Amino acid sequence: DLPPKTYVKRYFDLSKDQRDLYEELRHNYRSDMFGGALTVESTLARITRLQQVAGGFAPTDEEKTPRRIGEKRPRVEALLDVLEEYGGKAIIWARFTAEVDEIAAALKRAGISYVRYDGEVDVDDRRVAKDEFTQGDARIFLSKTSCAGHGLTLIQATTVIYYSNNYSLDQRQQSEDRAHRKGQTRNVTYVDIVANDTVDQRI
């Protein structure tokens, strides 16, 4: 039998700049809702934009370069606090490429060894990254659930951190199983980083 899973939520408050923009968007979206102007597709798009704000970026289409909101990065600070609290190797999952970029920069500044495994890394380098995590000294495996949530065995990790989530239950379950599968002998802790009073609490 596999060891148990432990689930933890780490809450933080948005910066003032984030909160102001978040509330402005939420007010506008509620007005659209009462006006009957929303479809399922447009509702999901609005939720995505709110999630971008909660992540520290102004709403944008995913293919465009996002703009940071203000100077404070409370979600990053929450992540670093979690890494300080939980030792050993860890997997960090994020939804947006801009978030992965920001996490990578924060890890580098903090002197925390990591590998990146997502669409910004070519296939050969991904293989090297995986080996550096599973067999080498890299402490952090940084990726997106949409890129690495299936097929990989990463049982060296005892902590799995969801910097942000999407609405795919399959991707969530599969990404959890990267560390919790045959060969794992230790308890695995799953930490969700959640912005207070935002869509994070509904995902």
Where are these regions (language model features)?
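Conserved Helicase C-terminal RecA-like lobe
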Residues: 2-152
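SF2 helicase/translocase ATPase core recognition
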Residues: 1-26, 143-203
